[in-house]
From Swiss-Prot:
Belongs to the fibrillar collagen family. Residues 1-627 are annotated as: Disordered. Residues 441-450 have a biased composition (Gly residues). Component of the acid-insoluble organic matrix of the aragonitic skeleton (at protein level). Residues 179-190 have a biased composition (Basic and acidic residues). Disulfide bonds join 731-882, 793-833. This is Collagen alpha chain. Residues 3-60, 513-571 form the Collagen-like domain. It comes from the Eukaryota. It is found in: Secreted. GO terms for cellular component: collagen trimer; extracellular matrix; extracellular space.
Length: 888
């Protein structure tokens, strides 16, 4: 029989793991599992290959017209216009002041002896003598002595007007008149053609986070973890059936921002858009400096005859003319009958003068008498007929139209002209008083010419004679005094470089140089700041359509490329379907403060407040005037007589009337002051808030200097500015606009930055005629500002390249120069100092800051970088800081 069970043996060591059993049959379907946790976001996939360029899209429909662009920058000066037609003759000038009285002329030649005067009255009868015998006819007596010269004859009638004198030789060129005042600004030139497209700008700063993208596709399964230690074998369960898929888990948290994709290729340029509307006229450019003197043109066309000028004042006496020729001898008179000779009577007492006897036989011609003194000057002759029209000159080349100058001061009197041809002999004067009968004298010889007579007064100006041949050019007049440096002109087209010479005064104009050959196309420059809208170009021809490429796989988002050049506006595309609402993004950072908004509409009147406390008693008024009261007051039956019945007595009426007039005058002045308070007129007493407010209240006011008070309050800190009506701006001028004669301090020669305020012996910052609080308010009341600086150079560079240039410091201590980023870089309007200018000659570079960041202006300091060596020099001219106002 079996024995009893033995004791339980010790537990054996663990056996080797058994081999895997065969798969069990599928177990029953398990219960639905709980929703699993959201899986982590998969790793970012490898960027796909760059897709091929897509086929060019159909042109979109035309877009709506863009907003009006800002006025373009002033284009370069246009080519000189054709010479204008000859203007209408100017109105006659005013009579000049009479010339100085001429010196007394030399004694004129003695006039010819006058004709015999009429017979005198008969004398009283003498005592009759005894009749004598008739004697024989006596022998003619010897010639008696020459009688005394007769009295001068009466002045002869004025002779006919002599022929027009030959044209005198051309007088010397008169001295150059004083420089006239600057003419008014000319009409603004046409907008220049758009400049070339600049090079692409540097990449912008990283933008803010965009709206979160849609969820990515699930990542691939991760690698298996390391195998765990083997566990104790469990009892083999029956395999369960495969359960259904669980519902998707909740949306996981947003994954981190993916790596930036590769930079995509630049898209093809869009087709040119439709022609835009014509832009507004650009701002008026600054006045250019006077150009070089042009060549002397050939004579212009013959102008129409001018209107006859008014008679000028008497000119200075001309030199005496030559003596006139002797007149022809008069006809011999008829012989008188001889009287009978009487006997010699006893000499009686001298009787009274008897009647004049009949004229005796004329004696032979006596010696020529001396020429008598000149008679008084006859009346002016009639005006001569106009001369024939001269030949037409060659047309001159078109000159540059200059600005109209004001009338210059009258020139000095010219030198006396050459003597004219002597006039013909005048008609014979009336008979002179009778001379005593002389005996026939012997023929006298021709007398010597007498001294010159006094010159006659100048007759009226004759009509213009035939135009003389063109005279040779007179010597150049001395240069006028140097005017103040004008504001910078608009950059002209760059001409050929002339030969270097020693700077001197302007010489005679040289011949016009030939146009230089067309330069090679330069490399594309960096993208500049957005320029003002230029003239709309004509649409270009569309390019050939490329072959359609196969669509490539989508690539990763590339890094934002630099902004390309602005394309022409495309046509408007079709309206797309509305997109799905995106998830709300995270709140963005606070943006920069916007520009000052326009004033809102006037709100409704508020509720009337409670009455305020009574004010303090006012000062005592001026004495009243019962005279005014007597006009204004009338009594009535209910309340008794008006106070006019109690007015003062009639004796005081005149005083009261004067007082009443003074009061009315004061009231009128107060009324005007109230008007000035409501609509300030820009005076020192009533300054406007800004120039825009001034022109808003006074539309008839023109551009000029006015007082403004931007910060309001007391008018003691009002500032005087230049108000530009066209540009709607208030311009503040520096107190020291022109800076020159600067000498470097020792130790600054090697430093690159040489600021006005530190590096020069006569150091100075640029200051302005305005308190900084007023300028702050001007900035607030404007929406953009601009200012320019002119750097005049001699052997000194101003703007060499993108790394080296002068520097401007704004009032916010920011520096603006060639290597600044684009938004801070000044605009170069003219650059003659890029390479130091022409050798030993002055040139200039003009820079402008035009910005909506009004805190940058005005400019307070300037730094030069290429000065200090021998032969180098520079000057500065700081323009006004102009704040352009908001139209509210």
């Amino acid at each position: 029989a079996p024995g009893p069970d033995g004791l339980t043996g010790t537990k054996g060591s663990m056996g080797e793991p058994g081999t895997d059993g065969e798969p069990g049959s599928p177990g029953p379907q398990g219960a639905k599992g709980e929703t699993g946790l959201a899986g982590r976001r998969g790793l970012t996939g490898i960027p796909g290959k760059q897709g091929r360029q897509g086929e060019r899209g159909e042109p979109g429909t035309a877009g709506s017209q863009g907003q009006q662009g800002q006025p373009g920058t002033q284009g370069p000066p246009g080519l000189p216009g054709k010479q204008g037609e000859t203007g209408e003759p100017g109105e006659s000038g005013e009579d000049g002041t009479p010339g100085p009285r001429g010196e007394r002329g030399a004694q004129g030649e003695r006039g010819a002896t006058g004709m015999m005067g009429p017979s005198g009255d008969p004398g009283e009868a003498g005592i009759p003598g005894a009749d004598g015998k008739a004697g024989e006819r006596g022998v003619p007596g010897a010639p008696g002595p020459v009688g005394t010269p007769g009295l001068p004859g009466m002045p002869g009638q004025q002779g006919p007007m002599g022929p027009i004198g030959a044209k005198g030789s051309k007088g010397d060129v008169g001295p150059t008149g004083e420089r006239g005042y600057d003419g008014k600004d000319g009409e603004p030139g046409r907008d220049g053609s758009p400049g070339p497209i600049g090079q692409p700008g540097i990449p912008g700063e990283k933008g803010e986070d965009g709206v979160p993208g849609s969820d990515g596709t699930p990542g691939s399964r991760g690698d298996s973890g390391p195998r765990g230690l083997p566990g104790n074998p469990g009892p083999p369960g029956r395999p369960g059936a495969l359960g259904p898929s669980g519902p998707p888990g909740p949306q996981g948290p947003r994954g981190p921002r993916g790596e930036p994709g590769m930079k995509g290729p630049a898209g093809p340029p869009g087709r040119p858009g439709a022609t835009g509307a014509l832009g507004q006229l650009g701002k008026t450019g600054l006045k250019g400096e006077p150009g070089n003197q042009g060549r002397r043109g050939p004579p212009g066309l013959q102008g129409d005859p001018g209107k006859p000028g008014q008679s000028g004042p008497p000119g200075p006496p001309g030199p005496s003319g030559p003596s006139g020729r002797d007149g022809s001898d008069g006809q011999k008179g008829s012989s008188g009958e001889p009287g009978r000779p009487g006997k010699d009577g006893i000499p009686g007492q001298p009787g009274s003068n008897g009647k004049d006897g009949e004229p005796g036989t004329p004696g032979s011609d006596g010696r020529a008498g001396e020429i008598g003194p000149s008679g008084p000057i006859g009346p002016k002759g009639e005006r001569g007929t106009p001369g024939a029209t001269g030949p037409m000159g060659n047309s001159g080349p078109p000159g540059v139209q200059g600005s109209k100058g004001e009338k210059g001061p009258p020139g000095t009197n010219g030198r006396n002209g050459s003597p004219g041809i002597s006039g013909s002999r005048g008609a014979q004067g009336p008979p002179g008083a009778p001379g005593s009968s002389g005996q026939n004298g012997v023929d006298g010889g021709t007398g010597e010419n007498g001294t010159n007579g006094r010159p006659g007064l100048k007759g009226e100006s004759g009509a213009p004679g035939d135009p003389g041949a063109s005279g040779s050019a007179g010597p150049a007049g001395p240069p006028g005094p140097k005017g103040d440096t004008g504001p910078p002109g608009i950059q002209g087209e760059k001409g050929r470089r002339g030969a270097d010479g020693i700077p001197g005064k302007t010489g005679e104009p040289g011949p016009q140089g030939d146009q230089g050959p067309k330069g090679q196309k330069g490399e594309v420059g960096p993208v500049g700041e957005k320029g003002d809208k230029g003239w709309t170009g004509t649409p270009g021809d569309p390019g050939p359509q490329g072959d359609r490429g196969e669509p490539g796989p989508p690539g990763r988002d590339g890094v934002d490329g630099p902004p390309g050049p602005r394309g022409a506006p495309g046509e408007m595309g079709a309206v797309g379907d509305p997109g799905l609402n995106g998830s709300m993004g995270e709140p963005g950072n606070k943006g920069p403060d916007g520009d000052l908004g326009e004033s809102g509409a006037k709100g409704p009147d508020g509720i009337k407040g409670p009455p305020g406390p009574p004010g303090p008693p006012g000062p005592p008024g001026q004495p009243g005037m019962s005279e005014i009261a007597s006009y204004l007051s009338v009594g009535n039956l209910e309340k008794g007589p008006g106070f006019r019945l109690y007015s003062s007595s009639g004796e005081e009426m005149p005083k009261q009337k004067i007082k009443a007039e003074n009061v009315l005058k004061d009231l009128d002045e107060k009324d005007k002051e109230m008007d000035s308070l409501i609509a300030p007129d820009g005076s020192r007493k009533f300054p406007a808030k800004t120039c825009y407010d001034l022109f808003l209240d006074h539309g008839n006011f023109e551009s000029g200097e006015y007082w403004i008070d931007p910060n309001g309050g007391t008018v003691k800190d009002a500032i005087k500015v230049y108000c530009d009506k066209k540009k709607n701006s208030s311009c503040v001028y520096p107190t020291n606009p022109k800076i020159s004669d600067l000498v470097l301090k020792s130790g600054f020669e090697s430093k690159e930055d040489k600021w006005l305020s530190k590096a020069f012996k006569k150091s100075e910052e640029v200051e302005y005629d305005a308190h900084y609080t007023q300028i702050n308010f001007l900035r607030t009341l404007s929406n953009y500002a601009n200012q320019n600086v002119t750097y005049a150079c001699r052997n000194s560079k101003a703007w060499e390249d993108g790394q080296h240039s002068i520097k401007l410091m704004g009032s916010n201590d920011m520096e603006y120069h060639a290597s600044s980023k684009i938004s801070l870089r000044p605009t170069v309007i003219m650059n003659e100092c890029a390479n130091g200018g022409k050798l030993d000659k002055w040139g200039k570079t003009v820079l402008e800051i035009d910005t909506r960041e009004r805190s940058r202006l005005p400019i307070v300091d300037v730094s030069a970088f290429d000065v200090g060596r021998e032969g180098q020099d520079f000057k500065l001219e700081i323009g006004p800081a102009c704040f352009h106002h908001i139209k509210y």
